[in-house]
A protein has these predicted regions:
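Short, charged phosphate-coordinating catalytic segments
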Residues: 130-153, 261-262
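Active-site/catalytic core of tyrosine-dependent DNA strand-transfer enzymes
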Residues: 175-238, 251, 259
Length: 364
């Protein structure tokens, strides 16, 4: 088991540690001691399942998906410690809450404007970057200045595989609105500094620093949402409708309406067409800029982005018109050439006939 754990990703190993800690906290609260696994080894199977069901119920405030993931990790740990569970018995003896799929709340531009108005400058920039870059919150708070490519109006973001969900690096972009606001902050940073993360303590693990930063940014969001009077919750779970993921979802939704495959590529989701892997950053940015106004929040900036894109579209339309006109000119030229060829053939034929007649006359 130890060897198997060592082959797992760092994030998975940290998750297993969290589950073990969770089970120990449950054991202390329920039975007054942390180490109850030796007791489980000696207990009857029915008693073991009673304890596990009590632990599942103890985690009732967590989502059904999270509890099932926790149990998967815990079961492996129990097996390693000598408590083996049969698959059929698990299905028959344990009851998990079913996931209820409520219709998810979609952020509006108005919502975002109200929330950002209640945030400090750096936090506001962070959420604009997450939204326009279609990034997960865990990716945003782990970005370092060296991951950003400057020099254009849109900052190019090179997300390293070490901080992504599927351990695959990717390229995305920040809107001109977000980039313009981020530049002053970057001027005060060294290349290896985290851009938005609040925790970068070398004494902590990467997971610990990540968790601390996520906790801080969630608190900032909750405070801003409360001030904006937008603290709605889902009836089935009591969870807040507006959370950190809502900003990423806003960007994905807006971009997906125009180009769903490109949206998946930028967001790091599976299932996009491989054609985007063959595009240069410049080509990807050109696609991004076509729909950038959809990812712009400030009303004035949004209007500027729309006007800029309209101008670009008009320029492309004019080029197309010019090409059509040029095509017409070329077609007319070819028609004239063909007409000239026919005329030349006719004149050549007449000349040959005249020459033949002249030769005959001379022979007479």
């Amino acid at each position: 088991m130890t060897d198997k754990i060592e082959t797992l990703s760092h994030a998975t190993k940290e998750s297993i540690k969290i589950v073990i800690s969770n089970f120990e906290n449950f054991s202390m609260e329920k039975y007054g001691k942390v180490a109850i696994i030796p007791d489980l080894k000696e207990a009857k199977e029915e008693q073991v399942f009673d304890v596990l069901q009590a632990w599942i119920n103890w985690n009732k405030l967590k989502s059904p998906t999270t509890v099932k993931l926790y149990f998967s990790h815990l079961r492996k740990y129990l097996h390693y410690m000598g408590v083996k569970l049969n698959d059929q018995d698990v299905k028959q003896e344990l009851t998990f809450k079913h996931k209820i799929d409520e219709e998810l709340y979609g952020l509006t531009v108005s919502d975002i404007q109200l929330i950002l108005a209640e945030m400090r400058y750096k936090t506001k920039v962070q959420y604009l970057c997450q939204l326009s870059g279609l990034m997960r919150i865990g990716e945003v708070i782990q970005l370092r200045k060296k991951n950003l490519v400057l020099g254009k109006k849109n900052i190019i973001v090179k997300i390293p595989p070490t901080i992504t969900k599927f351990s695959k690096g990717r390229t995305t972009f920040f809107s001109k609105e977000a980039s313009r606001m981020l530049i002053p902050l970057l001027k005060e940073m060294d290349d290896n500094d985290v851009v938005f993360g609040s925790s970068d303590n070398p004494k902590f693990t990467d997971i610990k620093n990540k968790d601390n930063s996520i906790s801080t940014t969630k608190q900032a969001l909750r405070a801003a949402v409360k001030k904006a009077d937008l603290e709605m919750t889902y009836e089935s779970t009591g969870r807040y409708m507006i959370n950190t993921h809502a900003f990423r979802a806003f960007g994905i939704t807006k971009l997906s309406r125009h180009d769903p495959n490109f949206a998946k590529k930028l967001a790091g989701q599976k299932g996009y067409l491989l054609q985007y892997d063959r595009m240069t950053d410049e080509e990807k940015l050109n696609v991004y800029e076509k729909y950038e106004s959809e990812l712009t929040i400030d009303t004035t900036a949004k209007q500027k982005a729309e006007i800029s894109q309209l101008k670009t579209d008009n320029d492309e339309l004019q080029k197309l018109r010019d090409m059509i006109q040029d095509k017409d000119k070329v077609e007319k030229m070819f028609k004239q050439i063909k007409a000239d060829e026919l005329r030349l053939k006719e004149l050549t034929s007449r000349a040959e006939a005249a020459l033949t007649a002249l030769k005959k006359a001379n022979n007479l």
